Amino acid sequence: VQDPKVIRELADEVGLIICATHEPSHKILEEPLEVVERLNILGCKHTAFPHPGSYAIDSMEACLVLANKLESAGKILRDGGKQLSYHNHELEFVRYANKSILELILTNTDSKFLQAELDTFWVQKGGEDPVEWCRKMKGRLPLLHLKDYVVTLEREILFGEVGTGSLNWDAIIREADEAGCEWFIVEQDTSTRDSFESIKMSFDFLMQKAEAQNQ
């Protein structure tokens, strides 16, 4: 389903809030007003730039060009009452002049116009520490994508339900909360289980953490 009106109706029927979206990269950069209109229909404040796609990030200069485009789009979204964030994968941890691509993009944009939607799995896959990145993004982390990092006995790396892998969730949740995170979003690309069982496992784990924190 792509029609935002249909998506909104389905969400309203079951009492779901649409907390954030991923829109096509070219739509965000080339047609940001259309993105604002779509988010208005969805009743949603946040969207994230999902992937560089055809936009080059193969040099420091290319990263700075992309950063400029993102800031320009972010200004338009902000004028429309929306917030643009950047969603990372592992490729954003390639380094130029000792700075990762993600650092280059975020340090060369105004945080009002571009925030971060960190993905815990991909930060780890990129060789970085999700806890440290949550700490670094204080005041700039409205959205956090949560999936665990599972390494099998055969050294295969898998997406995991939150709490089933090797990530330090107590520290991640603490640092993200202190950073001002508004939405903790479970996003598991694939699962070895039924999808509904998978999401329930992650939800139950996070609720247990929340209850323990509030005691």
Task: List each model region and its residues.
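Flexible loop residues that form catalytic
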Residues: V1, H26, P52, Y149, ...
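Glycine-rich, proline-tolerant flexible connector loops at the mouths of alpha/beta enzymes
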Residues: V1-A11
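Aromatic- and glycine-enriched glycan-recognition loops and surfaces
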Residues: D3-K5, V65, N168-W169
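A short acidic, amphipathic alpha-helical/loop segment
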Residues: V6-I7, E34-V35, E132-K136
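Active-site acidic/histidine proton-transfer and metal-coordination neighborhood
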Residues: E13, I17, T21, S25-A116, ...
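Histidine-acidic metal/acid-base catalytic patches
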Residues: G43, Y96-L118, W122-Q215
